[in-house]
Amino acid sequence: MEPATGILLPLLHRLPMELTDLPYSPGALQPHLSERSVALQHGQHQRGCVDQVNARIVGTEWEDAPLERIVRESQGALFEAAAQAWNLQFQWQSLRPRGGGDPVGRLADQVKRCFGDTASLRKAFNDAALGLFGAGWAWLVLHPDGSLAVVVTRNAATPLTSHSVPLLACNLWEHAYYLDYQNDRARYLEAWWKAVNWEFAAEQMPG
């Protein structure tokens, strides 16, 4: 019997966009973020966004486009799914096991110039994050003029669509912290800073 290639090949076709792996194990950010919380965000929420992107780009002009281009150039439901998928992946890189502390080198100099010190940056970041009503993201970004700033975006909006360079991302959707901290966003932010990846942030700075 000949193989039913007309049926099998479409099922084996590689989807345009795949869920990227975590840069560490789901339990590696404990005790700041639990294994269950990380696994839920990555395995369900981020996977769901990737699935939504694939459902909308197969057979279209976007099918072979990198995720960053889709985020920058698409609109509507495709943008929302693509941007949230990108934001979530950037979030995982913004965190690391045994993270926290203070930045060093050129990034530390910029923090001192723009905020005075790391403690003042944390306060500005936390104030902005706590001031957001509903879902969204808090970011540390580098503006084209070389200054650092804290930016808050609503829902899936992202600085990737602006001229600023994102350095760090903090997920302010309630599902990001409810399992560990219920509705206490302030405690979540305190834990987030203990896992922040300053090395990754510094690597995003051009030049």
Language model regions located:
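Feature for soluble, non-membrane regions of globular proteins
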Residues: 11-207
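N-terminal amphipathic/basic-hydrophobic helices that include classical n-h-c signal peptides
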Residues: 1-15
